[in-house]
């Protein structure tokens, strides 16, 4: 969804083809159902401690780090909070709020979604 939003922001017409019956279905199971959005630590920490193949993720993490993700969500109207271990969740603790925020962002950008 974020890649589609980024492409649409660059002026591209975008279609998401989703194999599941619902877009973002897997967001509901992250963070024990609360949707752990990101980890608010610096890129080097991610590359050295979180990722098993840092070279693969290097350019992606430096192009769009956790602070940019947090800024994006807040600009889209989603309040977030940082918990123990720098884990970032939405204030409501409802994964559905993250999904709704992303879906609204897709609609505002006229991204087409094709489901299962």
Task: Report the location of each language-model feature.
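N-terminal Rossmann-like FAD-binding beta1-loop-alpha1 element of flavoenzymes
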Residues: 1-16
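Conserved N-terminal/central alpha/beta ligand/cofactor-binding core
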Residues: 19-112
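A conserved short coil-to-beta-strand element within the FAD-binding core of flavoproteins
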Residues: 115-116
């Amino acid at each position: 969804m974020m890649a589609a939003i980024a492409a649409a922001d660059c002026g591209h017409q975008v279609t998401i083809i989703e194999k599941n019956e619902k877009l973002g279905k897997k967001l509901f199971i992250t963070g024990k159902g609360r949707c752990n959005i990101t980890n608010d630590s610096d890129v080097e920490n991610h590359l050295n401690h979180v990722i098993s193949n840092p070279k693969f993720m290097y350019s992606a993490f430096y192009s769009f780090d956790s602070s940019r993700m947090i800024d994006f969500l807040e600009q889209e109207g989603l309040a977030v909070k940082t918990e123990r271990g720098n884990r970032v969740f939405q204030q409501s603790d409802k994964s559905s709020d993250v999904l709704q925020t992303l879906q609204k962002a897709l609609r505002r950008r006229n991204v087409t979604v094709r489901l299962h």
